[in-house]
């Protein structure tokens, strides 16, 4: 399935108004202008729970070791959903462009000390205000994109995240690998594990996701509907040995419980899900008895993020990774609220939202 451009809802709100069940959306300034001659930019600001405004700002100037990027788009990350909901600890309004960290585009200015990167280069970047037409990034957090990827969306951060998780999983040919949760990340990991020669068991709630996993090369798919039925199914598939590697990619308690049950003795349980909603309980008796290696595959070193982005670009070039069919929903900047709500609600057929800046 290719990228699907989502039509704007009928009855889209005017400035300051709402439609039933929608987020409040306001717009400030003229329509978006991303021409090379413009000295202004537009950026989304989250003004409160479920509310955005679009602001027109002066273009920022890069510092000595920074580059400025005219962004083509930004992926929408599920980690945005907690601040979008407005928990007590969240402070509003956000900085312009804030929460966006999956941007790609074309360098249009560089700092005085920057070498090796020039205006006109297309790049993926690790930056933190990418819900806007332009953003600044440190020069060492920018990865040039090859000509072979021209025209393709490249939200570098989640692609790099998938590569880093795959590396920490230590997957090899002939292994049996279960992946619990076939969203964007789980689908990428399915591709990578299959290309590495593993036998992949994909487990997900949604029939759409299971069909997608089969297209990604999964050898077996299992509906995530009953804890003990899944365990027995995997036991039958593996001759009672269970799985060499299990990747939990949902960030919830039940998938974490299930992951432990599916991992064989001295196997590796990889936590790839983003757990945001409180403490977790684990079956330490089971983990101890089986001698599991438990890996928290989330990286926090920006240098590792950037190396993951480089690895993802290489994998896209050589065919090990093809994220293009996974970008299911595309929105304009002024529709960022719709993109966040779709990421939260996950309508049928949803996998990954992009916000693009034509």
Where do the model's predicted regions map?
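C-terminal hydrophobic helical "lid"/dimerization subdomain
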Residues: 33-39, 257-260, 265, 308-358
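Glycine-rich beta-strand-centered segment in the early N-terminal region that forms part
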Residues: 60-75, 87-129, 148
